[in-house]
Amino acid sequence: MVSIMPKILYNPEVLGHKPKSYHVENPERVLTILNSLKSNGFDDIVLIEGKSTINEILEIHSRDYVYSIINLSKSFNYYDGDTYLCDRTLDAALTAFKLAKEAVKLALKDRDLYFALTRPPGHHAGISGRALGAMSNGFCIFNNIAGAARLAKNYMKKVIIIDFDVHHGNGTQEIFWNDNRVIHIDFHQRGIYPGTGDILDIGGEEAKGTKINLPFPAHSTDADYIFAWNEIVEPILNYFSPDTVLVSAGFDAFINDGLASMDLTETFYRFVGAKLSGYSVTAVLEGGYSIGLKYAPPAFLDGYVDAKDVLDNLEDYTVINSNEVKSMVKNVKKIIGEYLDIF
C-alpha cells in the first residue's frame, strides 16, 4: 500500500505533435487520459518544465537517425507510412524524453508511482529508427522508456521493463538486446505489427534470458494475462526486487480499442497496478487510441492505490481455459529458465 497518490507528469508541449488530417496518434490521446484520471480522483498533475538535449537522445539513437528526425521535423513530413512529423514534433519528442527521465528520477527517490504522459510514443523506435526489421516506426520518434532505463542503470544493478502495450516493443528490445542488466518483459498480440517478439528471441550472446517475450493469441482475456503475470513476471520481480519497475504503459490491448484484437478490461490493468504496489513505478505512456485510454489508465492507478482490496476480491486465475496461452507460458518458462534460475 502506498502513502500518497500517484503523480502524473505532464507538459503541454507534447500536444504540439499534430497530424494534418485524422491520425489515431493525435493530441487528444493525452487529453483523454488527463480528463479520465481527473474524473476518477487522480488529479496530482506535476508540470515538468523543459526538454532533453540532442546529446541525451544520442545516448540511445544513432546520429544519422536523430539528424534525420531534426531535418524532417522542420515542416510536415512522414518518416514512413505510419509516422508523421510536423514543425513542433522535435520539441514534443524532446519533452516526452525528459518526462520519462524525470519520472524515473522521482520514482528512485520515492517509492510511489509516477506516470509520464509522453507523446509521441517511443517503444518501436530502435537505435536507427525502424527496429528488428519492422516496416515502420509505428508512430514513435525517440524511445522514451529506453532513456529512463539508461538513467536507471546508474542506480540499479538490474533494470526491469514491463511492456504491456499490445504491440511488441521492438525498439526497446533492440536497444537493450546485448545488455544483460536490462530485463525486458513484453506482453503483446502475436502476428500483428511489428511482427517481432518470438519466445525464442531472448537477447544477445551476453544477455540471453533477459529478453522475455509473451506473444498472446488474438482475443486473449484478463485471465490469460493474469495467469502469465503470476507465472513469469511475479517470480522475476520477487527475485530481483528492483528499486523501481519501469512500465511501457500502452493501453491498446483493451477490448475494442481499435488497432488490435485483445479482450482485456479494467480488471487486468487494476491487477497490474495492485501487483506493483510494493514497488516504486516509472510508467511511460505508449499506445492506446480510443476506449482503452478512458478506462485503463485510471484502473491501473486505482489498483496501485487500493492494492489489498483489489487482490482480496480478485477471481481465481490459477486455472485458465486457453491451452494456447498455457503452452506459451510453459515454453517461455522452460526457455528462460535455462538462463535465469527463477522458475
Curated annotation (Swiss-Prot):
Q: In which domain of life is the source organism classified?
A: Archaea
In its UniProt record, which GO terms are filed under biological process?
Answer: epigenetic regulation of gene expression
Enumerate the UniProt keywords alphabetically: Hydrolase
Q: Name one GO molecular function term.
A: hydrolase activity
| Pfam families in alphabetical order | Hist_deacetyl
- Entry-linked PANTHER family: HISTONE DEACETYLASE HDAC1, HISTONE DEACETYLASE HDAC1-RELATED
The job of this chain, per UniProt, is described as:
Putative deacetylase.
Return the similarity comment: Belongs to the histone deacetylase family.
Query: Any idea what this protein is called?
Result: Uncharacterized protein MJ0535
Q: Which organism is it from?
A: Methanocaldococcus jannaschii (strain ATCC 43067 / DSM 2661 / JAL-1 / JCM 10045 / NBRC 100440)
